[in-house]
Amino acid sequence: MSAYSCTLNKEEWSAHYNIKSLNGVVNQIETNSVSVWSEELTKICGGKTLEIGCGSGASSLWLAKNGRDVTALDYSESSVELVKAAAAKLNLSNVKVIHCDATKALPFYEKQFDYIFQAGLLEHFETDEQIRLLRNWARYGKYMISMIPNASSIPYRIGKQLMENEGTWEYGLEIPKHSFKEEFSRAGITVEKEYTIGSEWAQRFLPKRHYIREFFAKLEKDGYNLDDLMQGYLLVTIGKCEG
């Protein structure tokens, strides 16, 4: 079985997100050097917000810095330690960090949150499990936001394949989607909007000198918006939870 057909375990994820990253995460927030998806979340999320699978915590910390009331959870103890330490160093009292397995019932009451989001989690599960998780999470929030890799992004798809061929891909099973509307619908979530973001970020998966980069640079020079062409790295799906 290929390493790329298996989901990473807790220890493998902990190698990506741990206290060694503290200064880097804090610097991102202090210098306003956050990812395009963290920026996008500040445009969407208001009120009480829950992040499921917070990883480095950068998105939750950025939302907290921008005045949101945030709860962040992860099943990796090292991730939780990292985000708690970063929040303390940034003096952010409006972010709560919880160690919790998101594949099980969550320790919240129904509709406790205005927004629930995951960015970079659901792509590591097969479709049936994605739907089960969405259905479970939806009971705790009013709106659901999903950000997963975009299967229509040519630079991301080619770059990922190149890394798999070279044995340098680090994230195990990762299933991009052209659309996530059906999964939302089957989970009882009414889709309100779907689009892509991060076309520039998608090109980071490619070698620095690659003809696909040159092709997309020409498109941009000619006035094309690559996100409008569904070439963003992340597929953003927003929906209203029933109940």
Where in the sequence are the language-model features?
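Conserved N-terminal segment of class I S-adenosyl-L-methionine
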Residues: 1-110, 115-119, 134
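Short phosphate-binding/catalytic loops that engage adenosine nucleotides
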Residues: 68, 142, 189
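A C-terminal cap/extension of S-adenosyl-L-methionine-dependent methyltransferases
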Residues: 97, 193-243
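Histidine-centered beta-alpha loop that forms part of the nucleotide-sugar donor binding/catalytic region
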Residues: 123, 149-151, 196
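A short, conserved alpha-helix within the catalytic core of class I
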Residues: 125-136
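Conserved beta-strand signature within the Rossmann-like core of class I S-adenosyl-L-methionine
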Residues: 141-149
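Short, glycine-/aromatic-enriched active-site segment of Class I SAM-dependent methyltransferases
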Residues: 149-171
